[in-house]
Design a protein with these regions (language model features):
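Hydrophobic core register within WD40 beta-propeller blades
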Residues: 60, 136, 198, 270-272, ...
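Sec-dependent signal peptide recognition
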Residues: 3-10
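Long, low-complexity, proline- and polar/charged-enriched segments
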Residues: 194-201, 209
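Repeated scaffold domains used in trafficking and secretory/extracellular systems
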Residues: 134, 188-197, 267-270, 324
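Beta-rich carbohydrate-recognition and catalytic domains
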Residues: 23, 28-53, 63-129, 138-189, ...
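C-terminal motif of bacterial Sec signal peptides marking the signal peptidase cleavage site
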Residues: 14-16
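Bacterial signal peptide processing site
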Residues: 18-20
Length: 369
């Protein structure tokens, strides 16, 4: 198996090791208008493949015509006919194509990674660096995929985030096995950020950014859709505290922090989606270890955003050594007002290798707030 114990530390790079915060909504209360429930019927989508033995991250992109691209982080691939992780291959990312229905409980999924010799990452490494997914968006004729570059490092974890990588696919209606990736330049601030949670609203593509490595402050950029459709991001601007939208040359400092809170209030993975009433909903995990899934709302992509409000506690958060993370919504999926997933791991050394109930993404049904 390939570096299993280094893998166990992977999410710790991106999460502050603090106790879960006290969750409140925007007016200081503790009640949420939304609620959640587990969805085991949909969980089966990830447990039918004989070789794909689980992964984290779990981002989706609606490709149209009941086709949904799933992007996963660190992944276990069976070495033979036996479905066990103790002797599995370990790769840095994988993908799946959901088809047949936008309802995951009624759909099928075809998983993908590079083959030939031994399994390898679906989105390939670059030398000694690898990539973790950070979401994507289907435009009219173009697919944009967002990744976080991870470098080896001499810190306690052995690696660190090293900025974003954005690639485009010009033929998203074709089979993913035939896709060619073209790098596009996305202007970012002078300090390192990870890009994710792209959402289209009006004539713009909005993209969120997390200061990483750093304090997990969340910022927002917008790109004219006309430019994004042809891979031109030169018109990208960032939302500032007092001067509106500015390009990177005129930022003059840090962009506006759009998510209130700090530490584990600001998860390294989250989603943002437009709601039917014109407002916006963010879904994330909050806390560390025994986390909850929480939501935020805002009237516009740049806010003002509410503080996170807990709506669901995964059953795995009650376990000894719980390590539950990667909560996010999936706006292209049907079966609930909001379909969300989370990843369940363990801080108990080696447990994820033997406990096959862990590390398959879990579905949650949320009611719209």
């Amino acid at each position: 198996m390939m570096q299993p114990m280094r893998w166990l530390l992977v999410p710790l790079l991106l999460v502050a090791c603090e106790a879960p915060p006290h969750l409140t909504n925007a007016d200081g209360g503790t009640l949420c208008a939304s609620a959640g429930s587990a969805w085991p019927e949909a969980d089966a989508l990830f447990q039918r493949d004989p070789a794909w033995l689980g992964a984290d991250a779990a981002y989706t992109v609606d490709l149209g015509k009941a086709r949904v691209l799933w992007l996963f982080g660190d992944t276990f691939i069976a070495r033979g006919a036996v479905r066990q992780r103790t002797d599995a291959y370990f790769i840095r990312n994988s993908a799946a194509l959901q088809s047949g229905s936008y309802d995951p409980s009624a759909a099928s999924a075809k998983f993908a990674w590079k083959t030939g010799g031994t399994p390898s990452s679906w989105f390939p490494e670059n030398g000694t660096s690898w990539h973790w997914p950070a979401g994507g968006v289907r435009l009219t004729t173009r697919l944009l995929l967002f990744w976080t570059i991870i470098h080896p490092a001499s810190n306690a974890f052995g690696f660190e985030a090293a900025g974003p990588r954005v690639v485009s696919v010009d033929s998203p209606d074709s089979d993913p096995s035939s896709w060619a990736f073209t790098d596009v330049k996305f202007p970012t601030p002078a300090f390192p950020v990870a890009l994710q949670a792209p959402v289209v609203s009006g004539t713009y593509l909005f993209v969120y950014a997390i200061r990483e490595p750093g304090d997990h402050h969340v910022y927002i950029a917008r790109v004219p859709l006309k430019g994004a459709e042809v891979g031109d991001f030169s018109g990208t601007t960032w939302y500032t505290p007092d001067r509106g939208w500015q390009d990177v040359a005129n930022l003059g400092g840090e962009p506006a922090v759009v998510f209130p809170g700090a530490g584990t209030d600001n998860a390294p993975e989250f989603s943002v989606q437009a709601q039917k009433d014109g407002t916006f909903l963010a879904v994330q995990s909050v806390g560390f270890g025994a986390t909850q899934i929480a939501v935020r709302t805002a009237p516009a992509p740049e806010g003002p955003w509410t503080a996170p409000c807990a709506v669901f506690q995964p059953s795995e958060s009650s376990a000894q050594g719980a390590f539950v993370y990667a909560g996010k919504g999936h706006p292209g999926l049907l079966g609930a007002d909001v379909v969300a997933t989370y990843a369940a791991n363990s801080l108990t050394s080696g447990k994820v290798l033997t406990d096959m109930s862990l590390y398959f993404p879990r579905f949650v049904k949320l009611t719209a707030p």
